[in-house]
């Protein structure tokens, strides 16, 4: 039997035979994709057609050696600080993530407690109504009772989310909460209610969670027997269906009918998550299944309410020190609304913004000290890691040069950082006061937060009389929030004003300057309340009633003017935009273009750019030193795509291949081949400067592989039947 060809010693055949013969194509094993050429050393001294390359050693000059030593030190420092920034990012983001999880858990805690109380009260009433005898409980068939006893107690939990992505974590938290209270809990998703698996798949899923993971029988009697063993009957059985509206209606109806037949032997509580309305199951369940449900309604907090709670905990309370600029906040709000208000999309945006900040800003390592509550670590340790290059970068920041801070004030850097750390305290108090006033007009904290971040503070124009007239004639969407707050003050009742002042007093309790201004409003508030009480006296003459009405309106107007004055005082004195503070770039992410590119993405543009700069991706030294010159050691796909830039919309495959072949076989190799054929005496030469050129079949295979990769990435369109020798470019430029 003839030996087969190997990679090192390919059989000699023509290009036509190698591509047309099916036997050769199946049995001939050739490397058709080469990332970088391997060393051309002669392994074991027996491989033919491979020659050794001469290794040339040059002693570097002292200047080059010194320069390379400095570059290596700088490279080590850069790697050290890059690693350090990534570690600080993990610290900062872990604190932000934990804060968000705690906020979401607390926002649903009341509803979760209400669901558990409802389960316990209903379970105790079922037990007290009359427990089954042991002989009846262990029977393998349901007990015949009245129709009312076949009602399946159901909790309809309204999530008010358009996307299920936010509900997944909510129902996981609900499952953990009920299990911690001693309930037997199983959770089913909409995937379990498929028409293919039927109700048997649902029953098997329940038995695997309740009884044993290896159960493969869809028999509800197993559940009944398990419930009466090992004191399992002392706790209720809860089944959670997290996304009812996506379930197969007939399968869910069959499961409800089966479980209701066993409701006496196994007190089962069904929790159904709905996102649109409490009566959504009417659209998917059968009439018989609906009659078996005894529903109780529960409503979770809305996505906007959860968003406000997260925003308050992350940006307005001491958390990590990280914040965003005005433009970034506007983009995050727009992205949040475009993603159907899903909190998961906002958290994802926040994480990418935080990661981009640490990757772009060298001074972001200082944020680690902002994570420590009540600990002043910015004076010594925070500035020890600042190298000369980092310090130069710090004093070249736009906020530093704008405030005319020079390098001579280096010792003041810790004080500037401490000011950054203390600044959010009064700032956040004012934002929360505005939020309390905006609640009467259903304003969201996210809208107020975005407008207050405006570095130009255009909202202050609304407090001058001339600008008030202009604002009434020219609507400005940017200042809409503050205008709405001021307008709503005129429509508030005395009780609403009193409630707002009480909340302001609680918010500003630790900040005496603002708290004193709020306390000064109490006498005016008492006058308004007194005027309101006189207006409400019974049997008062119409003349006195009209006087008291005008008196109340006068007192209310005076009161609202005083409140507007306090709001103006808070905004002017304490609402200093973060982008106007020196060194704010340390903790504030401002590059909205980077964030937009990371979120929305431009995969085709990214692929094109990587192909044109492949030496940076592969860290190839030989390619990067030659600049834009094409070399045989480059990636085949990168070579082919760079050659495609020289063609128009339509590329001739033959010309493209010849250009590709020219790169892989330099002119020096061709000249050597000619010299070898002409001079027989130099046939046994074993050492040459360059390796042997690849075979024609190998070049064609590499060309086909590179063209296929460009087609998969969507950069070219393959030949058509009309023009089989041409391909068309789909994307242009980089």
Swiss-Prot record:
Induction section of the entry: Regulated by E2F. Accumulates rapidly after cell cycle reactivation by sucrose addition following cell cycle arrest mediated by sucrose deprivation.
Keywords, comma-separated and alphabetical: DNA replication, DNA-binding, Nucleus
InterPro entries: ORC3, ORC3_N, ORC_WH_C
Extent of Polar residues compositional bias: 12-24
Tissue: Follow a cell-cycle regulation with a peak at the G1/S-phase. Mostly expressed in siliques and flowers, and, to a lower exent, in flower buds, leaves, roots and stems.
Pfam family, one: ORC_WH_C
Tree of life domain: Eukaryota
A GO-annotated cellular component: nuclear origin of replication recognition complex
MF terms in GO: DNA binding
Subunit structure: Component of the origin recognition complex (ORC) composed of at least ORC1 (ORC1A or ORC1B), ORC2, ORC3, ORC4, ORC5 and ORC6. ORC is regulated in a cell-cycle and development dependent manner. It is sequentially assembled at the exit from anaphase of mitosis and disassembled as cells enter S phase. Interacts directly with ORC1A, ORC2, ORC4, ORC5 and ORC6.
Protein name according to UniProt: Origin of replication complex subunit 3
Gene that encodes it: ORC3
